[in-house]
């Protein structure tokens, strides 16, 4: 009878040891899952940049200023986003054209407002390829 009791106690100790090992394994697995989700979250952050932010990284300071001006001009729903879908080179040339036209209106706020209205009208249906020809300021 003593031998059976001793064997039974040994069996319980072994069984208890196996269960505690499973707990450690579960904790390790949950820790790995948590680490993976944290890594995924940090990897997703760079992808969340908007088209505007990605474009701004490639623009000069003058071009950024013109982009801000254009953003205030294109107030219609989705018009500025539609503008950002164009090719980067076309966007840069449009921003340079805006700069030259606004420089013509130096100190003439009425001319700048007229040009802003012209730009709004152009982007309501115009193609960016014709922007430099069709959107011009009236001030000299």
Swiss-Prot record:
Main location as per UniProt: membrane
Stretches for region Disordered: 22-57
Pfam families assigned to the protein according to its UniProt record, in alphabetical order: Mlp
Keyword Lipoprotein: yes
Gene Ontology CC: cell outer membrane
Top-level division of the source organism's lineage: Bacteria
Presence of keyword Ribonucleoprotein: no
Inducing factors: Weakly induced when grown at 35 degrees Celsius.
Localization in the cell: Cell outer membrane
S-diacylglycerol cysteine: lipidated positions: 18
Biased composition annotated in UniProt, kind: Basic and acidic residues: 33-57
Record key words, sorted: Cell outer membrane, Lipoprotein, Membrane, Palmitate, Plasmid, Signal
Family, similarity comment: Belongs to the Multicopy lipoprotein (Mlp) family.
Function: An outer membrane protein that may participate in pathogenesis. Some human Lyme disease patients have antibodies against this protein. The Mlp proteins probably undergo intragenic recombination, generating new alleles.
Protein name as annotated: Lipoprotein MlpG
Organism per entry: Borreliella burgdorferi (strain ATCC 35210 / DSM 4680 / CIP 102532 / B31)
Lineage, highest ranks first: Bacteria, Pseudomonadati, Spirochaetota, Spirochaetia, Spirochaetales
């Amino acid at each position: 009878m003593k031998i059976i009791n001793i064997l039974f106690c040994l069996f319980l100790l072994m069984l208890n040891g196996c269960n505690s090992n499973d707990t450690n394994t579960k904790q390790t697995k949950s820790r790995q899952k948590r680490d993976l989700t944290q890594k995924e979250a940090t990897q997703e952050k760079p992808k969340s940049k908007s088209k505007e932010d990605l474009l701004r990284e490639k623009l000069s300071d003058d071009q950024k200023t013109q982009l801000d001006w254009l953003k205030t001009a294109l107030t219609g729903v989705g018009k500025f986003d539609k503008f950002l879908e164009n090719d980067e080179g076309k966007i840069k040339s449009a921003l340079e054209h805006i700069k030259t036209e606004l420089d013509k209106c130096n100190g003439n706020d009425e001319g700048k407002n007229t040009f802003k209205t012209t730009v709004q009208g152009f982007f309501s249906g115009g193609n960016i390829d014709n922007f430099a020809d069709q959107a011009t300021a009236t001030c000299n």
